């Protein structure tokens, strides 16, 4: 199962008591703030959840799988996410209890 933005908004509606429009706007604003921070080069640290960071990947050699021809893969900037130890621990604990 995948959790979508629409489902997050529904959860805010059900559990927090926001109306559907407010819940949808809150979810959209949350992700917009993360996007804006990353676009400006800032990291996003969500305590107890994890960190979003930008990482520069240098140019590297690649290969066309059809022809075998070597082609350069251009340098680029990527977004990475690292889950916090707290989040990892909670997920591991949930699965350990579920299996045991």
Curated annotation (Swiss-Prot):
An example molecular function term from Gene Ontology annotations: DNA binding
InterPro entries according to UniProt: Hist_DNA-bd, Histone-like_DNA-bd_CS, IHF-like_DNA-bd_dom_sf, IHF_alpha
PANTHER family: DNA-BINDING PROTEIN HU (PTHR33175), INTEGRATION HOST FACTOR SUBUNIT ALPHA (PTHR33175:SF2)
GO biological process: DNA recombination; positive regulation of metabolic process; regulation of DNA-templated transcription; regulation of translation
One protein family per Pfam: Bac_DNA_binding
Subunit comment: Heterodimer of an alpha and a beta chain.
Keywords of the record: DNA recombination, DNA-binding, Transcription, Transcription regulation, Translation regulation
SUPFAM superfamilies reported in the protein's UniProt record: IHF-like DNA-binding proteins (SSF47729)
Protein family per UniProt: Belongs to the bacterial histone-like protein family.
Protein name as catalogued: Integration host factor subunit alpha
GO CC field: cytosol
Function statement: This protein is one of the two subunits of integration host factor, a specific DNA-binding protein that functions in genetic recombination as well as in transcriptional and translational control.
Region (Disordered) residue spans: 50-70
Gene it is expressed from: ihfA
